[in-house]
């Protein structure tokens, strides 16, 4: 049975308005989710325009088919159930060579967080899962119970940036020798045992960074985003734009670096002009990330860490 998606879209107007939508253009929503960005983008297209919407979660696609029904009836939407790391291949299969714009809303969606059985949340007791694609084989249970100490430390440091990574990895090792760690609550309690009292008093849940690290590992989120954003920039038509919303420093750092590499060039000294093959292919639309307004921050708590970066294709 399809579960309802209740998702408040973050930076809705900013993300789509910054794409400078062409009514007859071809656009991509790389992270369909609750379909908020897709719906607003479609409202700016003529019936000659088209949207390709990616999601690896069938539940998201099922719900979007209801929300976007008026546009589907006009033949303006194509859903692609796949990881966005396969963006270029899947669009080529659909006969698309160039796109006029693309948006990303990275990370886990509100409905995935809110569905207890998906195992994303440290606030709700559930089996350790955390798969965005429920057909995938690697789960949080596998990571927590079968990764060795060194691999746990690696992902906790790299993806969670938690200064207690070694102690938490050791405590997990000790706990699973007694019995497997099966639920989100069990894992959260183990993490709490390691954190000193002053850490537990800080704002935010003590397990947040470790849960983030495991989720990124299970879904290879940063690897997928890296590949996909580079493919997207390659596929953009001249003057096409890319909008990327991030929710934590690792995603934002990655996006900032990819945009920087595509929008700058190191020219050898002595060259009288820049050869075409050395010219940067992108330019930043906004030097600094765009942040949610005060009104949005008040209305949607999950928007607090959101940042939007936008770039434009200036050279093929």
Curated annotation (Swiss-Prot):
Q: What is its EC number?
A: 2.1.1.199
Substrates-to-products reaction catalysed: cytidine(1402) in 16S rRNA + S-adenosyl-L-methionine = N(4)-methylcytidine(1402) in 16S rRNA + S-adenosyl-L-homocysteine + H(+)
Disulfide cross-links: none
Has keyword S-adenosyl-L-methionine?
A: yes
Recorded hits in InterPro entries, A to Z, give: RsmH (IPR002903), SAM-dep_MeTrfase_MraW_recog (IPR023397), SAM-dependent_MTases_sf (IPR029063)
Q: Which UniProt keywords apply?
A: Cytoplasm, Methyltransferase, rRNA processing, S-adenosyl-L-methionine, Transferase
Q: Where in the cell is it found?
A: Cytoplasm
Per UniProt, where does S-adenosyl-L-methionine bind?
35-37, 55, 84, 105, 112
Q: Which GO terms describe its cellular component?
A: cytoplasm
GO BP field: rRNA base methylation
Q: Which GO terms describe its molecular function?
A: rRNA (cytosine-N4-)-methyltransferase activity
Q: What class of enzyme is it?
A: transferase
Family label: Belongs to the methyltransferase superfamily. RsmH family.
Role played? Specifically methylates the N4 position of cytidine in position 1402 (C1402) of 16S rRNA.
State what protein this is by name: Ribosomal RNA small subunit methyltransferase H
Q: Which organism is it from?
A: Streptococcus pneumoniae serotype 19F (strain G54)
The gene that this protein is the product of is rsmH
């Amino acid at each position: 049975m399809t579960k309802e998606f209740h998702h408040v879209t973050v930076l809705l107007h900013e993300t789509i308005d910054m794409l400078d939508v062409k009514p007859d253009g071809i656009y991509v929503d790389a992270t369909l989710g609750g379909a908020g960005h897709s719906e607003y983008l479609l409202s700016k297209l003529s019936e000659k325009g088209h949207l390709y919407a990616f999601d690896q979660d069938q539940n998201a696609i099922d719900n979007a088919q209801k929300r976007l029904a008026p546009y589907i009836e006009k033949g303006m939407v194509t859903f692609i159930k796949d990881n966005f790391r396969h963006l270029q291949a899947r669009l080529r299969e659909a006969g698309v060579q160039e796109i006029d714009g693309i948006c990303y809303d990275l990370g886990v969606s509100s409905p995935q967080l809110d569905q207890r059985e998906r195992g994303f949340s440290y606030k709700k007791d559930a089996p350790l899962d955390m798969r965005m694609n429920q057909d995938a084989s690697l789960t949080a249970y596998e990571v927590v119970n079968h990764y060795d100490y060194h691999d746990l430390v690696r992902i906790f440091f790299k993806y969670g940036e938690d200064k207690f990574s070694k102690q938490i990895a050791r405590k997990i090792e000790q706990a699973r020798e007694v019995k497997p760690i099966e639920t989100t609550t069990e894992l959260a309690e183990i993490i709490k045992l390691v954190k000193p009292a002053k850490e537990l008093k800080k704002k935010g849940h003590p397990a947040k960074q470790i849960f983030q690290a495991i989720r990124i590992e299970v879904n290879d989120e940063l690897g997928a985003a890296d590949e996909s954003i580079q493919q997207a920039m390659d596929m953009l038509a001249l003057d096409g734009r890319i909008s990327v919303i991030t929710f934590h420093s690792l995603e934002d750092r990655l996006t900032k670096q990819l945009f920087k590499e595509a929008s700058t060039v190191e020219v050898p000294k002595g060259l009288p002009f820049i050869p075409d093959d050395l010219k940067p292919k992108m330019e930043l639309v906004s030097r600094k990330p765009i942040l949610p307004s005060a009104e949005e921050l008040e209305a949607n708590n999950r928007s607090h860490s959101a940042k939007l970066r936008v770039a434009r294709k200036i050279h093929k």
